[in-house]
Structure formats: C-alpha cells, structure tokens
Amino acid sequence: MKWAEFRVHTTQEAVEPVSNILHELGAAGVAIEDPQDLVTEWSVKYGEVYELSPEDYPDEGVMVKAYFPMGATFKETIAEVRRRVHNLVSFQIDIGHGTMDYTEVKEEDWATAWKSFYHPVQVTEQVTIVPTWEEYSARPGEIVIELDPGMAFGTGTHPTTILSLQALEQAVKQGDAVIDVGTGSGILAIAAWKFGAESITALDLDEVAVNSAKANVALNSASDFVHVQQGNLLDDVASESADVLVSNILAEVILQFTADAYRVVKRGGLFLTSGIISSKREAVEGALKAVGFLIQEVNELDDWVAIVAQKPSQA
C-alpha cells in the first residue's frame, strides 16, 4: 500500500489540537518538529535531548507530520483534515501559516521515521516517559510511564503536559480521588495512580482518545485502578467527588466548565489546569476566581501556563 506523509505548518499553540485532529482521522503515526526544542532550557524539563539537528526543523513555527494510507478515501480524509485545522481559528487558536501538503513515502520508511522522534525523557524529578519499543532500566525511586506515541494524544514532552505532571506530582496524596478531564493519551491519569491516588477517573469526549487512553492504561498495568470513560467534560460527575481535578486542555474549553469544576472538587481540594497559552492566563484566572477558587500557584514553561487553584475548606 502507498502511504502519504502529510505536513501541517502551524504554531506551538496549535500543536496538540492539530495532532488530535490527525489522530481522530486515522493517522498511523504523528511526529512533531518544533525548533523550540533546540533552544528550550531542558534543565527545567530534567530530560535529555536526543539527536536534535537544526536541519530537521522549520525556521519558524512547528511542523506536524502524520502518516496516512493512500487508499480510496485518502482525498476525502485530507480534505477533512484541512477543514478541521482551519476551523481551529473559530476557537481563537492561532494556527500560524496553516499551510498543508503531503508527499508519497514508502511503507518501510514511514513505519520507522516517526519513531525516531520519541525517546525516554525525564519530565519531572520522579517521572520518565518511555516509548513502548525502548528498552529502559529504571533508577531506584524513578516512576516510569510507558506510552505508545503512535496512538497517543499528548506524549509527555509538550510543555503543557510537563506542567501538568509537575503539578500532579506535588498535589496528589496517598489515597486521593483524582479526575482527569480531557484525558487524551491517559498520561495524567496514569501518573496520578503512580503518585498514590486510589481512585482515578479519566474522561474524554472523543472515542479515539478513550481507546488510546485505555490502551496506555493497560500498558502500565493500571486498568484496575484507572477508569477511562467517554463523557463531555464534567457532565454527570457527582459533586464533591475529587480531591484533585486535573485538566490539560485549551483555555477556551476550561472557561466552559469552571463552575462545574468548583462543584466537583471537594472542599479544600485542588483544580490543576494547563493547556493555557500565556496570553489567556488572566481570563482563566478571572473565571476561576469568579466561581470561588483561590489561586495558589501559577507556573510557566515556554509560552504556556499551569494554574493550581483551591476550593476553600469552608466553601
């Protein structure tokens, strides 16, 4: 079968929604070429950069590559990708150039090409993300999360995911009940379990993401503890049921459910939000305060923000 390498030239802000679109429409693998990886202060991320060459990266913006079979429905699939990517603008997401093209590639080439972008990366003091095909020996006390990036929505190395993992690492206590809204790959839910949470619910509206999360949860032998469900944000979630609520999704989506988040978090509990571009920090902080949350901490990495908000104990 013939395969196509489909390329989207976009912005860092749009990387995750663009990647999600590609996965939802059947991409067999997705790779991200971000020149920011060449200059980021990697000591902040704890990890090591592997084989990064400036020649492989665009001069500006981010290149997202996906691999599709060139079958009977290929043209329709590509047309739908273009439509959905351009539609991100209606959600106030800057897609930058937004140019898209594709080239034909041999099956043996694409099958290994995208894997070269993924290696073990230590993203917090305790956590290392390891692709399933890599042999890796954990250090004493190290927490290893295995992911299959070929099907993942968020592979652990995007700044928003790193910020979320760092916040979870500090927030989760032994025996906590944790809810992950917009779970994607399931990485945050898996991490919450490894940090000591007793009951973890992972929610996503998208069926492809739900299946991806379930597979990654199984890879980490966490299926008995992490319950992945299809659902729209916090609809039908019981009040005061989460010690920690975490959500790494776009600011525009977070703004839609701050009141529901306040309802679901227990008194004294925490709401950890990321996926927030710096320019939208004030809007999210304002919405959280408006429903009663207290802002405890704000952390930044590159142009992204994570907010730790607490529901008052006497709420």
UniProtKB/Swiss-Prot annotation:
Gene Ontology MF annotations: protein-lysine N-methyltransferase activity
InterPro entries for the chain: Ribosomal_L11_MeTrfase_PrmA (IPR050078), Ribosomal_PrmA_MeTrfase (IPR004498), SAM-dependent_MTases_sf (IPR029063)
Known EC number: 2.1.1.-
Transferase found in the keyword field: yes
Top-tier EC class: transferase
GO CC field: cytoplasm
Keyword presence, S-adenosyl-L-methionine: yes
Residue sites binding S-adenosyl-L-methionine per the record: 161, 182, 204, 248
Keywords: Cytoplasm, Methyltransferase, S-adenosyl-L-methionine, Transferase
GO-annotated biological processes: methylation
Catalytic activity line of the entry: L-lysyl-[protein] + 3 S-adenosyl-L-methionine = N(6),N(6),N(6)-trimethyl-L-lysyl-[protein] + 3 S-adenosyl-L-homocysteine + 3 H(+)
Subcellular location: Cytoplasm
Bilayer-spanning residue ranges: none
Protein origin, superkingdom: Bacteria
Pfam families in alphabetical order: PrmA
Function: Methylates ribosomal protein L11.
Family per similarity comment: Belongs to the methyltransferase superfamily. PrmA family.
Protein name, as recorded: Ribosomal protein L11 methyltransferase
Origin organism lineage: Bacteria, Bacillati, Bacillota, Bacilli, Bacillales
Encoding gene (name): prmA
